[in-house]
Amino acid sequence: MDEASGWYDQGGGDVESLHNYFYPLRVRPRSRVVALSEYGGIAWPMPGHEPPRRAYGYGTAKSRAELTARWKKLQLETVLPQLKKGLSALVYTQVSDVEDEVNGLFTYDRTAIKPDPAAVRAVNQALEAAFEKTVE
């Protein structure tokens, strides 16, 4: 159970749930599962797939290449090192763009993936391999 989902954690439930968009991520081993339950949020309104309203994100990329580079850096330089320290779950913000946010991995109309799919696959495989080493 995740009692606080990123808010003021009072030590209840099975999960220590962290939301982190702007600060260095520092995970320490805990008695509960540590989950990064909100992170990412890199905005890029893909041309031709924008939502009907003006939208925002937690940082804006100017192109697919920049979005992919920033996403890769976040995964490999911020998330990956924390796996050895006990990070056990990830929830990226967010799966797809919505009416007022363009920080999804998929477009608002869900017809296109925004970062480069080959890069996403390679990084996800690296994260999975690193995680598997922590549970062996």
Describe the predicted segments one by one.
Residues 1-111:
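Substrate-binding/catalytic cleft of secreted carbohydrate-active enzymes
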